[in-house]
Amino acid sequence: MTQGKKKKRAANRSIMLAKKIIIKDGGTPQGIGSPSVYHAVIVIFLEFFAWGLLTAPTLVVLHETFPKHTFLMNGLIQGVKGLLSFLSAPLIGALSDVWGRKSFLLLTVFFTCAPIPLMKISPWWYFAVISVSGVFAVTFSVVFAYVADITQEHERSMAYGLVSATFAASLVTSPAIGAYLGRVYGDSLVVVLATAIALLDICFILVAVPESLPEKMRPASWGAPISWEQADPFASLKKVGQDSIVLLICITVFLSYLPEAGQYSSFFLYLRQIMKFSPESVAAFIAVLGILSIIAQTIVLSLLMRSIGNKNTILLGLGFQILQLAWYGFGSEPWMMWAAGAVAAMSSITFPAVSALVSRTADADQQGVVQGMITGIRGLCNGLGPALYGFIFYIFHVELKELPITGTDLGTNTSPQHHFEQNSIIPGPPFLFGACSVLLALLVALFIPEHTNLSLRSSSWRKHCGSHSHPHNTQAPGEAKEPLLQDTNV
């Protein structure tokens, strides 16, 4: 009996210690200083900088592990990860409303970075863990909730923009650094460095990041129930057909983001394998594209919104997306990829413009619901797009015969056609499929009114909206302003 009491006391002490890791006595956030956007920025930068270092090594390991069906397996791996993220993101968001953001920042960063050290230990385990890590690979969702906790509504657009710009900045520099270190010292050093940066990120969250969700905003008990309707990933998608304008916007988003998600997952692999880009050239391409995308989503977007209006900006962005996908599809020379990349950067204005249209036309109490639907559709595309692109590459027999030599200069490369089937007329079939999909999106977007009010008339919608209009769940317009270079694991 005495032994049982001792065990019970030890268990109680462990529970109290776990609570104190996140919240100090009296409910004061633990960490360095008050919660700020800069805490979120550092977390995002370190996580994606670590993954960015592995851009070139991942391409090599992917081909060595799956030499016969590289594109297909890449699509399946990223597709499984995307679908798991889509299914788990609402639940993790709902749980973070109950238990706070810090614990889930720690959880998502840990599991997102868990595959990194496995790259050299066991490639098979590396790709297996990448697939299942999608359950927790939702750092952005938790970070945006963290930012929403500590900012006023009018400040969130700028705060989200800062987070997105930091994400882009990490990808502008890290692939080039990783490619250089890999060429000089070997890929093993790059993996060790990426692992160290991931551990630094975890330590930073444990020691320096204060909890952002006030104690008074949480349920009194750790065992408090969560809203399972809020945790349902299909809840917002079920509401799509209840308003014709919302339906048009969501169809436009689905048809345009499906090929974009597939492109994110495979394009750098395509440059490396089919177009014979060296690791340094891929890194330079990512850097240039990231810089141009930031410029397009800030300066150019602002000018276009003022000069030609919201709807026309969306149409222009879709037009650029069609052009760049067609160019990627038919392009057979490296210089064509660089030229199409500039057009691709311009196409990144589409989703900020879509989000701005929704923000401007939806009622204040419906912002979270409509933005949540768009986010849900994009999450679904993150699962379907990579698998679709991988399958199209597979059925057209676009596969690698041998990797180009590291450090090869693009100006002296032989014809890239030697890297795919000789009877292939179209170098990049999935990109042409994507261009057709975006063309359909453009036709649908023509029917979206420039000035309208998203009056969601269904009483069930109104009831649903009431449960989603919590300030921590509302997605500000800036949340959709993501950089073009979203995928960092390939």
UniProtKB/Swiss-Prot annotation:
One of its GO terms (molecular function) is transmembrane transporter activity. The modification N-acetylmethionine is found at residue 1. GO terms for biological process: acrosome assembly; sperm mitochondrion organization; spermatid nucleus differentiation. Its main location: membrane. Glycans are attached at residues 12, 453. The keyword Transmembrane applies. Gene3D superfamilies: MFS general substrate transporter like domains. It is found in: Membrane. Residues 1-40, 96-103, 148-160, 210-243, 306-313, 359-379, 449-490 are extracellular. It comes from the Eukaryota. Residues 62-74, 125-126, 182-188, 265-284, 335-337, 401-427 are cytoplasmic. Keywords: Acetylation, Glycoprotein, Membrane, Transmembrane, Transmembrane helix, Transport. Residues 465-490 are annotated as: Disordered. It is a multi-pass membrane protein. GO terms for cellular component: membrane. The keyword Repeat does not apply. The chain crosses the membrane at residues 41-61, 75-95, 104-124, 127-147, 161-181, 189-209, 244-264, 285-305, 314-334, 338-358, 380-400, 428-448. PANTHER family: HIPPOCAMPUS ABUNDANT TRANSCRIPT 1 PROTEIN, MAJOR FACILITATOR SUPERFAMILY DOMAIN-CONTAINING PROTEIN 10. Belongs to the major facilitator superfamily. This is Hippocampus abundant transcript 1 protein. It comes from Homo sapiens. The gene is MFSD14A.
